Amino acid sequence: MQVIPNTLNFQVIVDYAHTPDALEQVLSALRPHVTGSLVTVFGCGGDRDCEKRQVMGRIACTLSDRVVVTSDNPRSEDPLQIMRDVELGCSGQYTLESDRDQAIALAISEASGGDCVLIAGKGHEDYQLIEGERLHFSDADQANKALAGRVTT
């Protein structure tokens, strides 16, 4: 778990939680420490266990106040199909945003006092696997970029 320092009145956390159990554990651990909304940004990997997608959607939507479902190493699969699979488990307030950079920016732009934005699934990884290519991507870097775009009022 990596806390992204910022001067705003909310937390941003990057975590590697990429399995149903890990996602449930991190959300359950964070919940008692969040006075505002718990917002989760996550996706499921492509060419991997399809059965966990709906389960992870249910866990995220049950334990979070808001969820942004996004892309996470789609590999050779269509990211939109992976997100639709996740969506089968979702209810409540959730958004689909296939561009992970935009998903992180959206969650951070909407965060307010006491909130916690959890960016789950990649953790320390600094790449996305898309159609056979390994492209540089860091959740922490994207979170810092989104935070830099926020103006304290």
Where are these regions (language model features)?
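ATP-dependent carboxylate-amine ligase
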Residues: 2-153
